């Protein structure tokens, strides 16, 4: 059941820690519509202010927007603002985290490795299909299951 898997994904990503209950309910509803009626999902996302009426909209874009708009997702462009990333990760990890351009050199694997070395968390890469840098934070113990669920649900979440 895709809805049950999506619920499990939200739980494993510790979504309740970051997102208000009403928005969790909203993303669950949108995900159900995404699987039933893509046009109805589009209408609801426009009504909620998640997308604009003139945006090209397909299933892949809808899934990316659900992640971007409703999950605790770091969003940046390819240049990465390291002050912003450090702030985001410090809040998510509930401890001070700092990485510099010199350490990371815009390489996701280096950032992920440092997060794993300094905490019980890891990072998951969100494939935007362009040169943006999006990532999710999750407990190391949940990474494998999150990737399995993302594969089943065809969500753009990778190691």
Predicted feature residues:
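N-terminal "domain-start" segment
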Residues: 1-91
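Glycine-centered secondary-structure boundary/capping sites
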Residues: 10-14, 35, 98, 119-123, ...
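Surface-exposed, low-hydrophobicity interaction/linker segments
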Residues: 65-124
